[in-house]
Design a protein with these regions (language model features):
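Catalytic-loop of the protein kinase fold
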Residues: 213-215, 220
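ATP-binding pocket architecture of kinase catalytic cores
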Residues: 37-213, 226-229
Length: 237
């Protein structure tokens, strides 16, 4: 039996991008004891997708991610892909939030979205935030970033079910081709040296040694840190 949905997908109660009535029904079916009077607050700082904190009447929190409002490129805002990666890494050595569920029915909230558990911690978005932390904690954060990145690159993509996430061959060649196309589309003058460097790199592509996961935007403010300087979760996949 189909459940009823409100058709409002614009600003609701002052929050654009969420439909409280529909989302309440969605949460009720997937979260035991979901409380009354949920609130939705957009988390500032992200630019690729809209991210909201969802809080029920008892104070429990979750995080909802959806594409930006308006026309978007599906490949750049693929919620199912992001949900799949985080779910696959749940039992790995890479810390990620626990996933609650994915919704690809756009009648619920105007666009696909997924929900994950809220991870408490520190997000170092700028120098001012970092300056409030002791030197030893900042040092540990830096080391943790490197260690977790190494763990990510060591994940066996087939073992975690991501072996078919993307093409497995010719990664460097495809990257060089993309960069040249982007350069040619954006340049307004002749820069022959750039093309010379491109041709040199193409001629020296090393043999591929394996297949791994590349985050694509791995940086400190796409992580949540503990007070001890350890990564609690890697975000923005």
């Amino acid at each position: 039996e189909a459940e009823p949905h409100s058709t409002t997908v614009g600003p609701v109660n002052g929050v654009a991008g969420v439909n409280p009535a529909n989302l309440r029904r969605w949460f009720d079916k997937r979260v035991d004891g979901f409380g009354d009077d949920p609130t939705f607050e957009q988390i500032q700082g992200g630019h690729s997708n809209l991210t909201f904190t969802v809080r029920d009447g008892s104070g429990r929190r979750w995080v909802l991610r959806r594409p930006p409002l308006g026309h978007v490129l599906a490949t750049a805002h693929d919620m199912a892909r992001e949900h799949r990666v985080i779910s696959a890494l749940a039992d790995s050595d890479v810390p990620v939030p626990t996933v609650v569920g994915l919704c690809e029915d756009t009648t619920v909230n105007g666009a696909p979205f997924y929900v994950m558990e809220f991870v408490d911690g520190i997000v170092v978005r700028d120098v001012a935030t970092a300056a409030t932390l002791p030197i030893k904690i900042r040092e540990r954060m830096g080391r943790s970033l490197v260690e977790v990145l190494g763990r990510l690159h060591s994940v066996d993509v087939d073992a975690v079910g991501l072996g078919n996430l993307g093409r497995r061959d010719g990664y460097i060649e495809r990257q060089l081709k993309r960069w040249r196309a982007q350069f040619e589309q954006s340049t307004t003058r002749e820069v022959p040296r750039v093309l010379e460097v491109h041709e040199t790199l193409v001629a020296r592509i090393p043999p591929q040694q394996g297949v791994g996961i590349v985050h694509g935007d791995y940086r400190i403010d796409n992580t949540i840190m503990t007070g001890d300087g350890e990564i609690a979760a890697v975000l923005d996949w």
